Amino acid sequence: SYVRTQRDLSLYGIKTFFCSNVCAAYKKEIYQELGGFVRKTIFNEDMIYAGKLIQMGYGIAYAADAKVIHSHNYSCMQQFHRNFDLGVSQAEHPEIFAGVPSEGEGIKLVKKTINYLIQKRKIWMIPGVILQSGCKYAGYLSGKNYRKLPRKMILWCTMNREYWNV
């Protein structure tokens, strides 16, 4: 268990304000004081809010003994679409994400997963991890650069088509 604050940014980067709504609890008074979640975002409202908390001098606590069961079983294309939206959210909120790249965290996760599969003698699963990770990264990179894409391409890439109905 730990509490992360602004002081941790140089050491942990984007992991300083990693947050997932499915596993989060918020102090109501602070949530209201800071205006809650951003009103319009394609994805990542939890991390945007957590980044705002850090910027305003608050901390984010992680409770190691908390129990949450949550999972996804996304296909490669679903991973692409989801991570496209993640990239869009980071591109649209540089006030939170500029200066804290997340690519390094993804690479660490891939390496850790591959090492785990090797240790467990499940080497046949490694190509799937690489394929899934490639789809995630391609989606993320496309999302970060969505402003350079034609609208038709954006609508094909996104998981949240309704977001683009302006």
Question: Across the structure, where does each feature detected by a protein language model lie?
Answer:
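Conserved catalytic core of nucleotide-sugar-dependent glycosyltransferases
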Residues: 1
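A recurrent flexible, glycine/aromatic-enriched loop bordering the glycosyltransferase active site
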Residues: 6-29, 41-42, 48, 90, ...
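A short, conserved alpha-helix in the catalytic core of glycosyltransferases
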Residues: 24-26, 30-35, 40-67
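Active-site-adjacent helix/loop segment of glycosyltransferases
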Residues: 60, 69-139
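Juxtamembrane C-terminal module of membrane proteins
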Residues: 109, 139-166
